[in-house]
Curated annotation (Swiss-Prot):
Gene (name only): PHO5
Protein name: Repressible acid phosphatase
Function: Partially mediates extracellular nucleotide derived phosphate hydrolysis along with NPP1 and NPP2.
InterPro entries listed in its UniProt record: Acid_Pase_AS, His_Pase_clade-2, His_PPase_superfam, Histidine_acid_Pase_euk
Organism per entry: Saccharomyces cerevisiae (strain ATCC 204508 / S288c)
Keyword NADP among UniProt keywords: no
Length: 467
């Protein structure tokens, strides 16, 4: 796979020789060799398949026919945000102004190291062939989206064989929009696809893919008292180790934490990162669980507002399923952010909400929530509705793996019988009220998600935002 990707990129590079980011010769031996750490990067690193696939075949069960397909995807690999880049640059400033020879795990900085953020215009943006730090980088968001499109055709191409004209939906974040466009490009020119760009501003209210932005009641400090109980001495230990190896360096625990982000986003930009080799395996586990803990209590089941936020998109998904027989469009593809996907999965009950994560230690038995498993860069959640004989079923496929509903999985391929699913969905949203809980009326008059139904007359074309 890696070789085929490299050959494809090299072919493209010959046509764009004037803009090739050549990198260094040593890169060839390093690029694509760090996939084992992707699960520990909290979703900031490149895409990888869901590890807990339970051995269930993703293929449509024998004798069944797909009736509807929905997909909610995250934008592809990107550069850091403006705010995070500021923090990374602060640590880089300390390192770049160190006047002595580096020792230990920082010794790579002696070898003409090139900082991966070359242009501030790249911040917040998708990594592409044009802005990647190395021509051989297989992890660009552009390549990921195009590869996803080819995988989609291989898995579900029959769903669009007789429907060459359809809409694809994206938030108006530029990186989400770019991912959607690269995906469309990857499908080929045999389709007439209308890209609907839906606003993610708070004024969009309920008519959005990004309900969290329309929720002024969202408290970003909620549950900090729980998360802050987590032991972060591993960060102190990293800083102490690096400072001991390099006299006078004076890195802090904040710098140590920043290095994890640096590692992830550098891999996105150049295909590998020497910074990632700074950490021990134990330190990666500690960092990864902190990301899980923080997400669980800020964007997942541990924050009581999330089920209501996620219900906005989940209710629309269920409505589409119920209308599959009368809707001309059978495939519904949408691109947005990781938070929106996490909110959706929380409401859907795919993320375990029966056992709250503990901040007292790193749990290994019974812990099924890992942020990076669900929302790596380029994450994708498919909702399949298929018919077998006279019965119809629903199941979820997350990042290439079938993930059954725990209490409803007795159907073919560990799916949920359709009426049982509707009962399940009704119970999941019982007591939720996105408009009321989020106080949406204070920022918008829009009280319903309608873009899946009125796109052909409204023609959504929100201005793109660098966020």
């Amino acid at each position: 796979m890696f070789k085929s990707v490299v050959y494809s990129i090299l072919a493209a590079s010959l046509a764009n020789a004037g803009t090739i980011p050549l990198g260094k010769l040593a890169d060839v031996d390093k690029i694509g060799t760090q996939k084992d750490i992707f699960p520990f990067l909290g979703g900031a690193g490149p895409y990888y398949s869901f590890p807990g696939d339970y051995g269930i075949s993703r293929d449509l069960p024998e004798g069944c026919e797909m009736k509807q397909l929905q997909m909610v995807g995250r934008h592809g690999e990107r550069y850091p945000t403006v705010s995070l880049a500021k923090t990374i640059k602060s640590t880089w400033y300390k390192l770049s102004n160190y006047t002595r020879q580096f020792n230990g795990s920082l010794s790579f900085l002696n070898d003409d190291y090139e900082f991966f953020i070359r242009d501030d215009d790249d911040l917040e943006m998708e990594t592409t062939f044009a802005n990647s730090d190395d021509v051989l980088n297989p992890y660009t968001g552009e390549m990921n989206a195009k590869r996803h499109a080819r995988d989609f055709l291989a898995q579900y191409g029959y769903m669009v064989e007789n429907q060459t004209s359809f809409a694809v939906f994206t938030s108006n974040s530029k990186r989400c929009h770019d991912t959607a466009q690269y995906f469309i490009d990857g499908l080929g020119d045999q389709f007439n696809i209308t890209l609907q760009t839906v606003s993610e501003a708070e004024s969009a209210g309920a008519n959005t893919l990004s309900a969290c932005n329309s929720c002024p009641a969202w408290d970003y400090d909620a549950n900090d008292d729980i998360v802050n109980e987590y032991d972060t001495t591993y960060l102190d230990d990293i800083a102490k180790r690096l400072n001991k190896e390099n006299k006078g360096l004076n890195l802090t625990s904040t710098d140590a934490s920043t290095l994890f982000s640096w590692c992830a986003f550098e891999v996105n930009a150049k295909g590998y990162s020497d910074v990632c080799d700074i950490f021990t395996k134990d330190e990666l586990v500690h960092y990864s669980y902190y990301q899980d803990l923080h997400t669980y209590y800020h964007e997942g089941p541990g924050y009581d507002i999330i089920k209501s936020v996620g219900s906005n998109l989940f209710n629309a998904s269920v409505k589409l399923l119920k209308q599959s027989e009368i809707q001309d469009q059978k495939v519904w593809l949408s691109f947005t952010h990781d938070t929106d996907i996490l909110n959706f999965l929380t409401t859907a009950g795919i993320i375990d909400d029966k056992n709250n994560l503990t901040a007292e230690y790193v749990p290994f038995m019974g812990n099924t929530f890992h942020r990076s498993w669900y929302v790596p860069q380029g994450a994708r959640v498919y909702t399949e509705k298929f018919q077998c004989s006279n019965d119809t079923y629903v199941r979820y496929v997350i990042n290439d793996a079938v993930v059954p509903i725990e209490t409803c999985s007795t159907g073919p391929g560990f799916s949920c019988e359709i009426n049982d699913f509707y009962d399940y969905a009704e119970k999941r949203v019982a007591g939720t009220d996105f408009l009321k809980v989020c106080n949406v009326s204070s920022v918008s008059n829009s009280t319903e998600l309608t873009f899946y139904w009125d796109w052909n007359t409204t023609h959504y074309n929100a201005s793109l935002l660098r966020q």
